[in-house]
């Protein structure tokens, strides 16, 4: 009985290598999509660090990067209520990165900042970083951060939103209502 001998031509071998490379690239993208951490939106509450939810605090403590909103004063000083809340929670300062929002009626400048933040967050997430984006009050209630949240959802990027205490609820409690 004669044995069958299979010979591959160099062209077929090269085509097979190219197919394998394409497959591995595709598989890597699937793994990144399904194995990466969701981008988390954490609500910081009305300003008192003690009023953050336990779930929000846990997300902040686990984060590799926390994107925090700030503004620049007329004197050039960086201002951030969100950063003061985070500082009060004793979160490591090295994980906090600021995104500076211009105080202007022209919202197109703000959208550009959010578009840049979107790209940075995606890049960090693709490097297997746990990404958190914070907002004062509740990130899902009357928050401009909703713009970037919607952009992630439209592009099928996995996101989580951690609820917080809105200022009007805290004010009602303070007033005894």
Question: Each predicted region: which residue ranges?
Answer:
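Low-complexity, intrinsically disordered or signal/transmembrane-proximal segments
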Residues: 11, 28-29, 34
